[in-house]
């Protein structure tokens, strides 16, 4: 027991924070992404919350976009604000504005790789350059584009946040979230795994990990069909005279 609860045994000891099924799932995602570390959570919002708890503190600010999922926006601008974290909500497609906004108190630059629902796309390498110049991570919610389809690390992303409820789960069988860490800021991963997963109670359930491990096997094939169907639908809608505009990134 002493070995287990001190963390020296390397074996699972308490299923709310370590479980072999969840660990297997994390390792599969790690292999698929080339990440340094992966942490699985019980929802996408749980993953995002843990990342912000790891990088931000009172007096810090998060440089982010005005376009994103509503609950994420509320987390940054309302919930974290109660703990003294400032939200700098700007246009991340305006690189000059980003340069002006990042300062010595910035904790990170955070964005959705494709914004929900506006489908706005920012220049990731430029944002990474600005973030790294200040010594802070670029954190991207990449839920809209599965990690099988692009290399976030090559674009300068330090940490990916994913709602695995979406494409990975696929069949609406389970909820989940992932933090995919590429190792450029190892202190973030240490804080998540050694403190936040223990204290915030947001660890993924073994059943969800099992279902999403199965989902990984068909993710690439399913996404290609979904993307093809979506493009066909968008083109059809665009051809209708009753519709003035179709906001779809692939058109």
Annotate the PLM regions:
Residues 37-242, 247:
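Conserved PLP-enzyme active-site core in the AAT-like
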Residues 1-49, 71-78:
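Conserved N-terminal alpha-helix of the aminotransferase class I/II PLP-enzyme fold
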Residues 249-251:
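Active-site loops and adjacent core secondary-structure elements that bind or stabilize anionic groups
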